[in-house]
Amino acid sequence: MFAMKFWLVTILALLVLLPSFMLHTSFAEKGTFVNEVKFIQYLDENTALEEVRNGNLDIYYFRVSSDRIETEKDREGIQVFESTGGSYSMLVNPSISETFNPFSITELRFALNYLVDRNLIVNELIGGYGNTMISNYGIFAADYLSIIDELESFHFKYNPALANKIISEELEKAGAEKIDGFWHHNGKQIEITFFIRSDDPVRKSIGEILSSEFENIGFKVNKDFGDLNKAFVVVYGSNPADQKWHLYTEGWGSSGFAKYDSVGLAQMYSPWFSNMPGNNDLTYWNYKNDYLDSITKKIYVSDFASAEERTSLIKQATKEGVSESVRIFLASKTDQYVVNDDIDGIINALGAGVPTRFTPINAKSDNDSLVIGVKQIYQGAWNPVAGFSDVYSNQIWLNLYDPGVFSHPFTGKMIPI
């Protein structure tokens, strides 16, 4: 009888405690500090800066040129946050078609690493706010130190004479000849189309400089200037075999810092991830690399038995990705974001910077709404399945849903949301 009473009391106690425990662990303690978040497009960073200073914008989700916020007077009325995580790269079209494509030759693509002056990009174009890159791993990436020996083994330095030598040798092997200073193949002058982002001053300058380098080697360069919308049509939306483009100046952002990055190598180098020329459209020519696919899939699904094996896989994938040179990384950048002085609670996350999903959740304003300026509002596929392929729409999308887990803004460890 005593035992029955004991168990009855225990069960009743659990029934009393359980609801309060469930309520405590299932619901957030409080909501956000604002009731509404507005996103407004501002293409011009200088205009956006003044709007933030005047209080018409609370935050601007795009970098502001360092020379605009150098002095104490320049920073009156605003807060400035610095963040790493963004980068620049050059996408190369390696397709094979009826028209001769010089970039279908792997060794020729690899030579482009000597044609780009990475130090010039960092020191001059972005004013020292960045570092040179040769792979998708920047110096602040969690895995950078474990693969630094692999990266340094390439010994890349700006050497246009060496690039010219390699490119010339490969073109001659392919049957091309130089006539009056320009390369020809089968009696036709070789023309390359460089799609250059005109809406980004840095990428525009990179494209202009590299175009001159290619012209010095003997290529006829057609410069096609355009913005994000045009890039999605011409570069990412066309059949690479049609050769509407050969080179493209890319820019990358980050949604956060990952302590164990399982996606980066697949995203930047591997065909299976659908982010390489052709994008796995069955009606297009597609870049293929079974070796890279095999390695990056193992990293993606954690198919390794130790940290040492994981590092080995990362080294192999990095070496192959850089050697193939379909996507050539140029520089990482330190972005400077501006916020109005009256806004508190900004989260400057590692990798993502101020545009992290945690900023709108935590930001405090004297008003019920938070007004955020963005560089672009791309009207693409707002679809969580194979959509949101640009950083601008992702900055909005990541505030519209709660994933099961997300990387901690300061440690990179996965935390439950």
Q: Locations of the language-model features?
A:
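Short helices/loops that flank or line small-molecule/ion binding pockets
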Residues: N46-L57, E107, E208-I217, K230-W245
